[in-house]
Amino acid sequence: MLNKIGFFQLDNLIQGRIPFLFINLGPEIMMWYSSLSRQHLEKSLFATNEDQIIPNLTAQAIADHTAIVLLCADGERSSKIAIDLEKRGYTNVYVIDGGYQQLVTERQQA
Protein backbone atom coordinates (compact mmCIF):
# COMPACT_ATOMS: atom_id res chain seq x y z
CA MET A 1 0.00 0.00 0.00
CA LEU A 2 1.35 3.38 -1.00
CA ASN A 3 1.85 5.78 1.93
CA LYS A 4 1.17 9.37 0.90
CA ILE A 5 1.95 12.54 2.82
CA GLY A 6 1.47 16.22 2.06
CA PHE A 7 3.15 19.50 2.88
CA PHE A 8 2.01 19.53 6.52
CA GLN A 9 3.51 16.11 7.28
CA LEU A 10 6.75 16.82 5.41
CA ASP A 11 7.06 20.18 7.16
CA ASN A 12 6.57 18.47 10.54
CA LEU A 13 9.37 16.00 9.75
CA ILE A 14 11.71 18.85 8.83
CA GLN A 15 10.75 21.30 11.59
CA GLY A 16 10.72 18.50 14.20
CA ARG A 17 14.11 17.25 13.00
CA ILE A 18 12.75 13.72 12.67
CA PRO A 19 15.28 11.36 11.05
CA PHE A 20 14.38 10.32 7.50
CA LEU A 21 15.95 9.92 4.07
CA PHE A 22 14.72 12.48 1.57
CA ILE A 23 15.00 11.48 -2.07
CA ASN A 24 14.19 14.57 -4.12
CA LEU A 25 13.70 13.94 -7.83
CA GLY A 26 11.93 17.27 -8.30
CA PRO A 27 12.69 20.97 -7.86
CA GLU A 28 14.63 22.18 -4.85
CA ILE A 29 12.77 23.07 -1.63
CA MET A 30 15.70 24.07 0.61
CA MET A 31 14.98 27.79 0.17
CA TRP A 32 11.65 27.34 1.98
CA TYR A 33 13.40 26.80 5.31
CA SER A 34 15.47 28.71 7.84
CA SER A 35 19.11 27.80 8.25
CA LEU A 36 18.51 25.39 11.17
CA SER A 37 15.72 23.49 9.40
CA ARG A 38 17.67 23.63 6.15
CA GLN A 39 20.60 21.92 7.90
CA HIS A 40 18.32 19.06 8.96
CA LEU A 41 16.94 18.77 5.44
CA GLU A 42 20.47 18.74 3.99
CA LYS A 43 21.45 15.93 6.40
CA SER A 44 18.32 14.01 5.38
CA LEU A 45 18.95 14.40 1.66
CA PHE A 46 19.89 11.16 -0.08
CA ALA A 47 21.42 12.48 -3.27
CA THR A 48 21.22 9.98 -6.11
CA ASN A 49 20.07 9.57 -9.68
CA GLU A 50 16.72 7.89 -10.18
CA ASP A 51 18.25 4.74 -11.67
CA GLN A 52 20.73 4.49 -8.80
CA ILE A 53 18.32 4.68 -5.85
CA ILE A 54 18.11 0.92 -5.19
CA PRO A 55 21.83 0.22 -5.74
CA ASN A 56 22.80 3.16 -3.50
CA LEU A 57 20.41 2.18 -0.71
CA THR A 58 21.84 -1.34 -0.85
CA ALA A 59 25.47 -0.19 -1.04
CA GLN A 60 25.00 2.09 1.97
CA ALA A 61 23.22 -0.67 3.91
CA ILE A 62 20.14 1.47 4.58
CA ALA A 63 17.92 -0.52 6.96
CA ASP A 64 14.58 -1.65 5.57
CA HIS A 65 12.71 0.15 8.38
CA THR A 66 14.32 3.55 7.66
CA ALA A 67 11.80 6.30 6.87
CA ILE A 68 12.19 7.25 3.20
CA VAL A 69 10.34 10.22 1.68
CA LEU A 70 10.20 10.55 -2.11
CA LEU A 71 9.45 13.74 -4.03
CA CYS A 72 9.16 14.27 -7.78
CA ALA A 73 7.39 16.84 -9.95
CA ASP A 74 3.92 15.27 -9.93
CA GLY A 75 4.09 12.15 -7.75
CA GLU A 76 4.14 9.64 -10.62
CA ARG A 77 7.84 8.71 -10.61
CA SER A 78 7.94 8.72 -6.82
CA SER A 79 4.99 6.34 -6.64
CA LYS A 80 6.65 3.84 -9.00
CA ILE A 81 9.88 3.97 -7.00
CA ALA A 82 8.00 3.59 -3.70
CA ILE A 83 6.24 0.48 -4.98
CA ASP A 84 9.60 -0.96 -6.06
CA LEU A 85 11.12 -0.18 -2.65
CA GLU A 86 8.21 -1.85 -0.86
CA LYS A 87 8.59 -4.95 -3.05
CA ARG A 88 12.22 -5.05 -1.96
CA GLY A 89 11.23 -5.06 1.72
CA TYR A 90 11.40 -1.38 2.69
CA THR A 91 8.55 -0.86 5.14
CA ASN A 92 8.57 2.87 5.86
CA VAL A 93 8.33 4.54 2.42
CA TYR A 94 6.33 7.73 1.81
CA VAL A 95 5.47 9.68 -1.33
CA ILE A 96 4.58 13.36 -1.44
CA ASP A 97 0.99 13.16 -2.70
CA GLY A 98 0.77 15.09 -5.97
CA GLY A 99 4.51 15.78 -5.99
CA TYR A 100 6.13 19.19 -6.02
CA GLN A 101 3.12 20.79 -7.72
CA GLN A 102 0.78 19.83 -4.88
CA LEU A 103 3.42 20.64 -2.26
CA VAL A 104 3.60 24.23 -3.53
CA THR A 105 -0.20 24.53 -3.50
CA GLU A 106 -0.48 23.20 0.07
CA ARG A 107 2.38 25.41 1.24
CA GLN A 108 0.63 28.50 -0.13
CA GLN A 109 -2.55 27.51 1.69
CA ALA A 110 -0.78 26.93 5.02
Give residue ranges: language-model regions.
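Rhodanese-like catalytic fold shared by cysteine-dependent sulfurtransferases
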Residues: M1-F20, L25-A67, A73-A110
